[in-house]
């Protein structure tokens, strides 16, 4: 938010679904200094009442003179903000740094356009692509700095997904721990075709209403009743050819829940299922300079491909060092930031 002299007097971002939008935060910070100024937004200000009031009403009420928009809102329900602002006599400039805006909002844009979440696969691996030793020892392959970056990724996603094998082996909490989104609890999704998740698992004992256990028709009635009594959300979805939860149906279901960004943390079979379904949009692999070898667990299993022509191709977008570890970020070529947006 710029005042009439071009000085920055406010800024904001949309921290959580259902919470105030970025414009509201920026205008609240600016107060009366916003009148007659310019507000710069990434997506077009919303024009419809949903979980929050329309942002265009807040902008009009604040006496803003000019609005600069990077990308139009593709949602036909929420769009129309530009037209509304112009009808009120406010100057609107569109398409400024639109490519940067698209990259910044590509997870949200995927959900708006396809009504499915953007899927990010995350793993900590050795140089030879292993996520555990042959005995199952996996804590810790990467160092503390890499693990902290992994926790940041949880803050950027609406839900965390693992398979029941990870629950049985590691009993993870699958929580946000950095406090970057206060009041916004991440959803926890467990793929468990036969409902083997035990009632004493942390994801069941702690905030069970935030846990979704997804199974197929193969689950026994007593296990359905057991988890229902524990208070978790349980949903049956179709099975694929391997009698596991069909990934396309899962993404449709999560999209209907409003989950726009899904972080898939494994294990190997779960990662394999998502790659087999060509459902992974983004990859974060944290690589430690070690060799495990032998029959240790690989990062991605599943069915795989028969030829290199069939391999899933991605674009290397960024790489960062975390002490001795290397963070590699890849996206689909069509979603890549090929121009280096800043």
Question: What is each of the regions a protein language model found here?
Answer:
Residues 1-2, 124:
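Hydrophobic beta-strand positions
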Residues 2-4, 113-114, 332-333:
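Active-site beta-strand termini and strand-to-loop segments that position acidic
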Residues 2-100, 187, 212, 273-275:
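Zn2+-dependent cytidine deaminase-like catalytic core
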Residues 10, 51, 118-342:
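Enzymes that bind and transform nitrogen-containing heteroaromatic metabolites
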Residues 27-31, 60, 109, 151, ...:
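Generic structural signal for well-ordered alpha-helical scaffold segments
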Residues 30, 87-88, 112-114, 282-283, ...:
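Short alpha-helix boundary/capping motifs
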Residues 74, 78, 94-97, 112-116, ...:
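Short capping loops/turns at secondary-structure boundaries
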Residues 82, 96-124:
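Proteins enriched for Cys/Gly/acidic motifs involved in redox and nucleic-acid/cofactor modification
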